[in-house]
Amino acid sequence: MTSILTNNSAMAALSTLRSISSSMEDTQSRISSGLRVGSASDNAAYWSIATTMRSDNQALSAVQDALGLGAAKVDTAYSGMESAIEVVKEIKAKLVAATEDGVDKAKIQEEITQLKDQLTSIADAASFSGENWLQADLSGGAVTKSVVGSFVRDGSGSVAVKKVDYSLNANSVLFDTVGDTGILDKVYNVSQASVTLTVNTNGVESQHTVAAYSLESLTEAGAEFQGNYALQGGNSYVKVENVWVRAETAATGATGQEIAATTTAAGTITADSWVVDVGNAPAANVSAGQSVANINIVGMGAAALDALISGVDAALTDMTSAAASLGSISSRIDLQSEFVNKLSDSIESGVGRLVDADMNEESTRLKALQTQQQLAIQALSIANSDSQNVLSLFR
């Protein structure tokens, strides 16, 4: 039926044209933005995941920047420590030279003074962005320095920033800015070699080799030994598990220390039940007397020089250990930085697979829609001409 009030063919053609135009708009939007899922209305689940992961990727970018800053701090500290080690090696060599008979120790001291000033200069200069890891205030104990290492999200959705920690303590900083507990401003005590103790128990003597102890391992005054008391054959016995002999600090080894203790049936200490007698102090410590930072060898004797050389060598050991720790952290930061780069690329790639548009597919679809649009316009034109055909009947 032909009607001049309702043109069903034109309405159908117009509806088709509108649908094609809407599809073209969507396709053009995907082509211009490059996104298949550009908003939550396109795909709520994928859009939500992509938005969250993009946010995490931005956080990882900040982590990457922080790792670069941390690497610079560590590298600066390592370079300073490495330079300081070379200077302390020179000081040690000067001290060894000073042990030679007839040398002018005052002249050697002048050279050592310049080297000490160089150590101070190195420690002061080893700073990056206001952070100095070669000197610190240790009056309140160790100071922890941190470098941002990663940004993580667990299965429950909780996020956290992980850090790489480095402790500034008496064995890792060159100078204590307030006290004297840094590697270069503390006095080292050097343990003597092990000695042999002669133990006399009820008249029977036996020898026992006792290794020297470092200062830190000595038991404080007032400590007690542990053991069991027993009676057998009319004699008193004490089974000793731990005996500590107090070590004296002296320029040379102290002698003549002894421990004497006895037991009776009642457990009272009387006399001569057992005796530990030593010819030399079993755990004596020779004090270097000076730190690396305040060395003065003018007028120093041979024994004191030997102790000082041992003290400087102990400082070198601590510095080498600290440099190794810094090197390990530097290596870890490099590995973490490489990992964060790869992780960021993986996240970006994963998000792309979720929301990116396939440009080949979209361009092909656009060509097809343009053809459909032209045909729909032609169909609408034909449908609109039906009313003109009706008018021709009345001519």
From Swiss-Prot:
Main location: secreted
Subcellular location: Secreted; Bacterial flagellum
Entry keyword annotation includes Metal-binding: no
GO cellular component, one term: extracellular region
Source lineage: Bacteria, Pseudomonadati, Pseudomonadota, Alphaproteobacteria, Hyphomicrobiales
Keywords in alphabetical order: Bacterial flagellum, Secreted
Name of the molecule in the record: Flagellin A
Keyword Secreted among record annotations: yes
Leader sequence segment: none
